[in-house]
Amino acid sequence: MYPIPSWVYDSVVYQIFPDRFFIGKGKTVEDKKDLYLKRGGTIEKWGVPPRKLPGAQHVKVFYGGDLWGIAEKIDYLEELGVNAVYLTPIFLSDTNHKYDTIDYFKIDPQFGGKRAFVHLLKVLHSRNIKLILDGVFNHVGSQHPWFKKARKKDPEYVNRFFLYRDRHRSWFDVGSLPELNVEVEEVREYILKVVQHYLEVGVDGWRLDCGHDLGPLVNLWINMKVKEFSSEKYLVSEIWTYPAGWEMVDGLMNYNFRSLVLSYVNGETDSIGTELERAYRETKNIFGCWNMLDSHDTPRLATTVPVKDLRKLAIVLQFTYPGVPLVYYGTEIGLTGGEDPECRATMEWNREKWDMELFEFYKKMIRFRRTDPGLRFGEFILLKEKPLAFMRKAPHPLQDTIVVVNPEEEKNVVLSLPDGKIMNATPLFDIFTGEKFHVDGGVVKVPVGRRSFRILKPIDLRVGRYRLYKRV
């Protein structure tokens, strides 16, 4: 296990599906139509909801978003407060999702090509925003040169795939996604060469697609290459399991967290504290894991949790549980959408259509998560199961953070705070309401409203020249 890069502890990641974020250089998808039509695609106007088509033809429908457009929205990213961007694949491919790579060393012209990529990287770094790329190394697209040669029985390439008499092995048996034989040395060297190349260009990390399919050893090999380049480069892996046991990478996409939290706020269970505490204790790289609530592979948060007060509870947990919060583009303004492709709708740029109250809530949570020591690296201590309450215990008691999340009716909650340096009479300040609750013998009593939450911070008590924490 390698140390997690230092910048990860302070990060909030923003996920972007490039075709659906923004079209740069003042263009429309109509202006760019030749880029799509000549490669078998179709185009659609911005704002028209995506829909599933027969034969999965929706993967060939393009809206025109590109890397130029992302760079032009840098002020928006800065306003929101995120400091890392994760892009779904950007390499040459004939689909809008680009998980069927044709050439890893070519940025797709549909996204602006190499010039747009270099420009975006420069713009992001000028605002101290990191860039994380999506590495799809479990499989390639059926148009990848290697696979085309293998299909023709070229002996140099046949063993790089899994070919049978009448078919080939592919991801989830999707024929257009032939799986690579990562046990073959030439395949591993090729993958590591791709990883090395973009680290040299300046990207800050990689997200490994289908990390579970790659297996622990390949995850380790890739992270060894990443850390050989720099200990400050980041590797996170897509693994839809309980998060423990994958310490060979810096973290994984914590879908286990997502499932627990959504079940809790939607009333499918009345307690998840034990599960969260166990995962924290057993997952050695928990601080490098992504706290997910939605993504390009799931229904959007506003669809799975339509009641906004309950949705806020999920967001509070996302930003206060150990790990890196990941915000899927548009979730911060209330975009809805079901299963793929509905969850991959275009970003709405008309602010009159935004849920501005939700947007401001996200901004505050992002700012708090990035600056609060307790949330950045504090220990997770479960205080109560019903309603869920926990402490993020930091090195200094005034850096501690206490969180209570109540998806049910109003409750008066009594919490014993397991930090012997939180002094008697210490005020606990609610960062949202401004209310104060005083500690009495290490215990605090807090009313928590229906479908509501508390985020409490200790503050130093001063009476005249007297300071409660003068020697702590």
Swiss-Prot record:
GO terms for molecular function: cyclomaltodextrinase activity. Addition of 1 mM MnCl(2), NiCl(2), CoCl(2), ZnCl(2), CuCl(2), or 0.1 mM HgCl(2) inhibits the enzyme activity to 0-6%. Activity is increased in vitro upon addition of CaCl(2), DTT (relative activity 147%), KCl (180%), or EDTA (180%), as well as after heating of the enzyme. Is not inhibited by acarbose, a potent alpha-amylase and alpha-glucosidase inhibitor; on the contrary, acarbose is degraded quantitatively by AglB, yielding glucose. Its EC number is 3.2.1.54. One of its GO terms (biological process) is carbohydrate metabolic process. The active site is at residues 209, 238. It catalyses: cyclomaltodextrin + H2O = linear maltodextrin. Keywords: Carbohydrate metabolism, Glycosidase, Hydrolase. Signal peptide: none annotated. Optimum pH is 6.5 with pNP-alpha-D-maltoside as substrate. Transmembrane segments: none annotated. Disulfide bonds: none annotated. The keyword Transferase does not apply. The record marks 297 as: Transition state stabilizer. Optimum temperature is 85 degrees Celsius with pNP-alpha-D-maltoside as substrate. Remains stable after preincubation for various periods up to 48 hours at temperatures between 50 and 90 degrees Celsius, pH 6.5. The half-life of the enzyme at 95 degrees Celsius is 2 hours. It holds the Pfam family Alpha-amylase. Is able to efficiently hydrolyze alpha-, beta-, and gamma-cyclomaltodextrins and linear maltooligosaccharides, to glucose and maltose, by decycling cyclodextrins and liberating glucose from the reducing end of the molecules. Shows a very weak activity on starch and pullulan. Cannot hydrolyze maltose or disaccharides with various types of alpha-links. Is not active against beta-glycosidic bonds of poly-, oligo-, and disaccharides. PANTHER family: ALPHA-AMYLASE FAMILY MEMBER, MALTODEXTRIN GLUCOSIDASE. Forms a mixture of homotetramers, homooctamers, and larger homooligomers. Belongs to the glycosyl hydrolase 13 family. This is Cyclomaltodextrinase. It comes from Thermotoga neapolitana.
